[in-house]
Regions:
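Single conserved hydrophobic/aromatic residue that forms the stacking wall/gate
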Residues: 86-93
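N-terminal hydrophobic or amphipathic helices and topogenic motifs
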Residues: 2-85
């Protein structure tokens, strides 16, 4: 049986990977915003936001996860991009 310390260490590793992926997502979103601005397109795309949430819900359901929790997480990521965009003119997604 795995002890508590080992499980916590594994959980910490997963948490750090999640943070790394969020960082990667933010960087990609920033690059998308730059491309949109150069093309004269609006940085906010409500259709894309909806698509992101639908894809997240579908994937969560396939993994037998609670979709509401995943939607909340994705909305936080989108909200983060919105606030960053407002502060520095970057895109959402």
């Amino acid at each position: 049986m795995t002890d508590l310390k080992t499980l916590r260490e594994q959980l910490t590793e997963v948490d750090m990977k999640i943070i790394d992926l969020i960082h990667q997502r933010q960087s990609l979103s920033k690059n998308i915003g730059s491309i949109k601005r150069k093309a004269g397109k609006p940085t906010r795309d409500f259709m894309r936001e909806k698509q992101v949430l639908e894809l997240a819900t579908s994937h969560a359901e396939k993994l037998n996860m609670e979709p509401d929790v995943i939607v909340d997480v994705m909305q936080l990521l989108i909200k983060d991009r919105k606030s960053t965009r407002l502060n520095s003119s970057h895109a959402l997604i």
